[in-house]
Amino acid sequence: MSQSQFDPYVQNGGTTVAIAGDGFAILAGDTRSVNGYNINTRFQPRVHEVGDDLVIGASGFEADALALVKRIQQRIDLYHDNHERKMSAQSCACMVRTLLYGKRFFPYYVYTTVAGIDKEGKGEIYSFDPVGSYEREWCRAGGSAANFITPFLDNQVNLHNQYVPGSHGKERKPRRLLKLEEAMKITTDAFTSAGERHIEVGDSVLVKIITKEGVETRIIPLKKD
């Protein structure tokens, strides 16, 4: 006897990488959208400008991702009407938390990241789980290839288990905020390597670079197969 099941979610792939640096934040996402072994489209953005020099990264179930980004944009517009000022990245993160937590019984199947610039001019990265728990981080990989990219970021950005030469394992290497070109090279290498190992990563990477001057967009080509 067969039993019908309700499964409203689809994994459409998508991987995002975020790095906070000295005077900038990078949020990048690959553009391949899949359903199993089928490619739906080769250009589906996973990073979205929502105004106020804020960028949202959303990957996972594409319908939920687009719905969440639309709700965030609506909330930012409402914030402008009520307060007549720009929304900060920290305020945006708190708002996204309430949106995700409010849907906790039927959550958005999305890996969400918020990127912006703080009051001191440093990059801000906030990463979320599907029900709203979040934290500020130096870097974060989310989505289908996160397991491949996270160890690379831990090594190159977080400097996990790395020590000052000659200290005999007693003095850890201090973390530092990266320069823009350093972060861009790490981002490019991360997606290039993931594309060689994961079938859901490919086609191109859409990169949003947030600075105090605004948001710059770059596209990095990836393999098409």
Curated annotation (Swiss-Prot):
It holds the Pfam family Proteasome. It is found in: Cytoplasm; Nucleus. Coiled coil: none annotated. Keywords: Cytoplasm, Nucleus, Proteasome. It comes from the Eukaryota. One of its GO terms (cellular component) is nucleus. One of its GO terms (biological process) is proteasome-mediated ubiquitin-dependent protein catabolic process. The keyword Cytoplasm applies. Transmembrane segments: none annotated. CDD domains: proteasome_beta_type_1 (cd03757). The 26S proteasome consists of a 20S proteasome core and two 19S regulatory subunits. The 20S proteasome core is composed of 28 subunits that are arranged in four stacked rings, resulting in a barrel-shaped structure. The two end rings are each formed by seven alpha subunits, and the two central rings are each formed by seven beta subunits. The catalytic chamber with the active sites is on the inside of the barrel. Non-catalytic component of the proteasome, a multicatalytic proteinase complex which is characterized by its ability to cleave peptides with Arg, Phe, Tyr, Leu, and Glu adjacent to the leaving group at neutral or slightly basic pH. The proteasome has an ATP-dependent proteolytic activity. Belongs to the peptidase T1B family. This is Probable proteasome subunit beta type-6. It comes from Schizosaccharomyces pombe (strain 972 / ATCC 24843) (Fission yeast). The lineage of its organism: Eukaryota, Fungi, Dikarya, Ascomycota, Taphrinomycotina.
